[in-house]
Amino acid sequence: MTQSNEIAAELAHRIQADNEHFGGTMPEATAISWRGYLAAMLEWNLIAVAAYDELRAQVPAVKDDPAIAILRGRG
């Protein structure tokens, strides 16, 4: 089974590739997708909290981030 740090490294590579693809300005829809994907990885214990925080910092902020609302629960 792939180790958490290997998964985090692969995700970092993919995020960097997307940032380069979009000329350093990732569109909001892509950022929302990445944030949701990272939240799922965290929830299923595929990456550690520290890795999640580091990876999320590489993705542009999203106002009223739906991934955070889903991850934490709405109620």
Which role fits each region the language model picked out?
Residues 1-75:
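Acidic, Ser/Pro/Thr-rich low-complexity regulatory regions
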